């Protein structure tokens, strides 16, 4: 009985001490930094403290706020990140703010319009002939479907043309990791090509508004082409690059026809999209015709790079043995 009384006395004393400590804690700790829940453990206390701090930072407009103003978004958003990752504040040469987050000023360039557009690789081997006629066979259904709607045709073309560089760069990236060896810069060159083709697409999306069934066609064609090209590149890189070279030759032809329609007045020569003006460093009063001219020049450079890559393989070498044409515009 004495033992039981002693236990009860110790338990009551412990409860009183805990209550006194809690009162002192509330009196001494500033409310700005601590919010102790009536029920719950340290986990709830930590969560409530972080939420209090986050709310306080949002109200006070702390430096962790990141303004996001990407083109195409509705208005501006204020994103508060615990990690404190902030975008660089970039300005143009004239001091105005750089408004594009998808590319930076040092990634822009002036296209080389003097490139020879008529260069052609004459197919001599069986793989070359197969690649050539495969690409030629794709022109007929494309002409039938799009006819003279060259804006939508360009969108379809660029969704396909952006695939080979990504596939080739991805496979070379894995090969470099697997073999513990450098790529000779070809990973960067091929991914650069894919990004350039994607920028073509983003530009023409500002000009042409594809219909829903054209968007569905893009999804289907891209899915089929990606898997087919992936298998083809694994089996024979020289065949894959040769086919892309011929595909780029067809792109040059397509954009040449686009220019003819613009010159004949069948397509309105609207002002160039703002993204195109900054990406290709065009004049402020540039038009759609100027955009088509620089895009066609890009395709000619991609033609050269892929035929060159195929020639390297045909000569019994690997791409890493030849310096990659990085920044070849």
UniProtKB/Swiss-Prot annotation:
A single GO cellular-component term on record: mitochondrial inner membrane
Pfam families (UniProt xref): AOX
EC number: 1.10.3.11
Membrane topology: Multi-pass membrane protein
Co-factor binding comment: Binds 2 iron ions per subunit.
Catalytic activity: 2 a ubiquinol + O2 = 2 a ubiquinone + 2 H2O
Membrane spanning residue stretches: 154-174, 216-236
Molecular-function GO terms, alphabetical: alternative oxidase activity; metal ion binding; superoxide-generating NADPH oxidase activity; ubiquinol:oxygen oxidoreductase activity
Catalytic class of the enzyme: oxidoreductase
UniProt protein name: Ubiquinol oxidase 1c, mitochondrial
